[in-house]
């Protein structure tokens, strides 16, 4: 992934993968969420479940959530958002709805825009800010 080394954790604590920048030891925790699209009049939508417990479990190494949608036999551009930003959207902007220990995030895609619960998430499309490309 952009020159980072990827590792799968031995113990399931809610992370799908760890990515490491070898030259300085930078570690990122990543949770990948996938969904299939539902066609809409002006685009498509997708729904994702995130554990409330995991989202609220803020540690010194934040989780980066990557949301991907399978639409027309292709993967959408990834929505990449840090745990603290997603939690802030949930707690302060009414993004997502809580149900049975999970938060359900409903994304709607139109042209090059993405919204979640009416909030603009366009800034998170392919947001590799915390994953700069590494030249070897």
What residue spans do the PLM features occupy?
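Mixed-charge (Asp/Glu-Lys/Arg
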Residues: 1-13, 19-136
């Amino acid at each position: 992934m952009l020159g980072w080394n990827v590792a799968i954790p031995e113990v399931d604590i809610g992370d799908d993968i760890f990515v490491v920048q070898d030259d300085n030891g930078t570690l990122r925790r990543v949770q990948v969420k996938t969904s299939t699209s539902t066609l809409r009049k002006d685009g498509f939508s997708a729904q994702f479940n995130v554990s409330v417990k995991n989202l609220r479990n803020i540690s010194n190494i934040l989780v980066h959530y990557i949301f991907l949608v399978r639409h027309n036999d292709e993967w959408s551009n990834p929505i990449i958002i840090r745990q603290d930003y997603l939690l802030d959207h949930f707690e302060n902007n009414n993004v997502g709805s809580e149900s049975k220990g999970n938060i359900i995030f409903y994304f709607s895609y139109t042209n090059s825009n993405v919204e979640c619960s009416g909030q603009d998430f366009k800034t998170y499309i392919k947001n590799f800010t915390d994953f700069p490309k590494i030249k070897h």
